[in-house]
Every structure is written in structure tokens, then in C-alpha cells.
Amino acid sequence: VLRLLPAVDVANGLAVTHRTSAGGDAGAGISALDACLRWVEAGADWIHLVDLDAAFGRGSNAALLAQVIADLARLHPGVSVQWSGGVSSADDVERALAAGAKRVNLGAGALKDLAATTALVRRFGRHLNVCLDVSAASAAPSPAAPADPAPSGAAQLAGAQRGAAQPATQPSADLATYVVHPRGQGGPVGPLEPILAALNEAGTGAYVVTDRVRDGALSGPNLPLLGTLSGATSAQVIASGGVSCAGDIAALQDLAASHPNLCGVILGKALYTGQIDLKALLRP
């Protein structure tokens, strides 16, 4: 089953309804706890909680994130939090885990020191996800047309699953054409393939994979990249970026049928624009 992780991005002490690819605030700020509760009350059992200021090197909301996690644990003890944004060291990971996060995303910028990253992987095991923010090595790939934004919700998802004309074999991507390029600070880290090989050898438990071109663009997930990368690792893979409607989620579920380690998808902008109805999708 593909887990749906609604994202709550926090900047300047407030949750922003969506953000630009450069991390800029693109919507009115609301209480971070209220934003989380909105998705929990819609049925979410995981929250992807992001410190945008830490991710883009302009401050920290760590104390607020810790308070939000504590409040969620008190109000909804069955909900888990995935902490993301600006995590680059053992101290960062320990702080997030001590605050009650179940999983912590290590930022792609940490991959500049691959030896240190593999040491963190071995130390924190299943509690650590490694972010792979990637872009094409030469020219950016053209985003695929998004799935038809037909009525959102369970009916749309079921219809997409029944009627989508999926190819028998999903198209593949050439991982050699991608580089790891963090969305926060700094330029490209290096080619994806050798980095992935080193992380696999270290025993990485999960990757969060984001195609930078699609992040926040509502242009559909990069299915060839996700399928090929899932086939190149035994680790869990969480898709991030581009999801625009329930049809995109159905396409990811189809892909997960042949790549069972593709286990989750982070939902962002489409939730806040109303293009995805989380409550309807999670309804039994």
C-alpha cells in the first residue's frame, strides 16, 4: 500500500500553504499545528514536517517543530512525523529523534561528504531517510503532462486504477544522466549512480526521491526515474514532487505493484490548491 504523507512546510514560525521551488513563501501562513491537524483529521497517519528556513539556510524552526510533534503526540498518539529540512549532521538527527520524530530526512547537501553520510546511515539505521534531489546532468527533462484532473477523491482514484491505459512495461530512465543537486543550499553534489551505489552498500533504509524540475510544478511524478531507481535498490523509496491529482497517485500505485519498495508519496501543493482531496482518498 502506497502511504500518503501530507507535507507541512514551516517558514518564519508558520506553515505556508505552498512554496516556490526556491523555498519562497507562496501562500498565507497558518499555525503549523493547525496545518498538521487538518491532515490528521482527514485521515493521515504520517505528517511530513519541513523546516523550510533550515533547508534554505536562513534560520531554524526546530523548537517549533519539536512543540508540534509533542502536541500531535498528545492529541493523536497514533500519528507519526517525518522531520525534514536542514538536517546534515548527527546532532541534527539526534535532535529530531529526541523531539519525537519517527523518521528524519538527511538533506541531499550532506552527500557532499559521502563517508560521513554512510556513517550516519550505519548509525541511525531505519530512522534515517536519505534525500536524493536530482536533476538532469545536461538539460532538464521536459515534464510529462499531468494526469487529467478529473474529480478528486476516492472515485477518481478508483476510476484511474480501473481505466488508466498503463503500458505493460513502464518506461525506464538512465540514472547515469542524473546528478544529485540539493534544492536548498549549494550546487550539484555529483553523479547519481555512484552516490546511490555507495549508499546502497552502506545499507540505507529509505530514499526520498525528488526530481527538481517537477517539485512544486504540478506536472506529474517522474515515473521512469522512480521505477528505475526503485529497481536499483532494496531500500524503500518515497516519491516527492510533481503529484497533481489522484490520477498521479494511481499511476504511482501501478508502479509500486511491480516495485514494492516504492512505498510512499509526499503530497504538497496539490493538497493546498484543492486538486487532491486527502480525506476522500483515505476513506476506507
Locate the predicted segments by residue:
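C-terminal helical cap(s) of enzyme catalytic domains, especially alpha/beta-barrels
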Residues: 116-123, 253-258, 262-284
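Catalytic beta/alpha-barrel core
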Residues: 47-53, 80-89, 102-113, 131, ...
